[in-house]
Amino acid sequence: VLSNIIANQDVHEKYGGVVPELASRAHQVNIIPVVDMALKNAGISIKDLDAIAYTRGPGLLGSLLVGGSFAKSLSLSLNIPLIEVNHMQAHLLAHFIEDNCDVKTDFPFLGVNISGGHTQIVYCRNYFDMEIIGETLDDSIGEAFDKCGKMLGLKYPAGPKINKLANEGNENKFNFSKPKVDGLNFSFSGLKTNFKRFLEKNLKNDKFFIE
């Protein structure tokens, strides 16, 4: 990997979550500067590219359209191949990028995708043959983290902040319901609702409970 540039979208912070329309607009503003910086950091020119890979999905439609349109236009102008990528599959294969990785993985293997939009257990037979054998039936774990964080008054994204606070706290002080789901699937909406009621009950008795 010669360069890896990320443009943060702080515009979502005051809304406590990703706003699709704002995300796509931010993509439009950032995509050219991000590509320019990636090329500069890699020490190459745009004419040195041999192919272009882009996220075909899944994701927010507006943001996908911005990225896809830019990638297709650049591919046509440079007359180089365009490679569509399912970014959830790419997450599972990302560890193959590192040649000096301490832990070597070979096929078949089980992978877990955990993100703001997905929670999946995936059986990977090879680079192109993958099967989801377990997934969330409602909210993803990342979504549950962010929504619970919003209830606590934490800024988006709340997940890392909740994790930090949890590591500093007493894990046995409170008990929450554990979802009962068949097979290898997950469910987090019940836990989120349980947490909401827990906060409402305790704040009713003590308005400084969260403090």
Locate the predicted segments by residue.
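N-terminal beta-alpha supersecondary unit
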Residues: V1-P58, H87, H91
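A short glycine/serine-rich beta->alpha loop
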Residues: G16-L22, Y54-L61, I132-T136, P179-G183
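Active-site nucleophile and cofactor-binding loops and adjacent substrate-binding regions
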Residues: T55, V66, L82-Q89, N113-I114, ...
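Nucleotide and nucleotide-moiety/phosphate-recognizing core
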Residues: G43-D48, F70-H87, A94-F96
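Short Gly/Thr/Asp-enriched flexible loops that form oxyanion-binding sites at enzyme active sites
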Residues: Y54-L78, I97-E98
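Conserved phosphate-binding catalytic cores of ATP/NTP-utilizing and phosphoryl-transfer enzymes
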Residues: V85-F109
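A short helix-loop
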Residues: V103-F107, V112-I114, Q120-F209
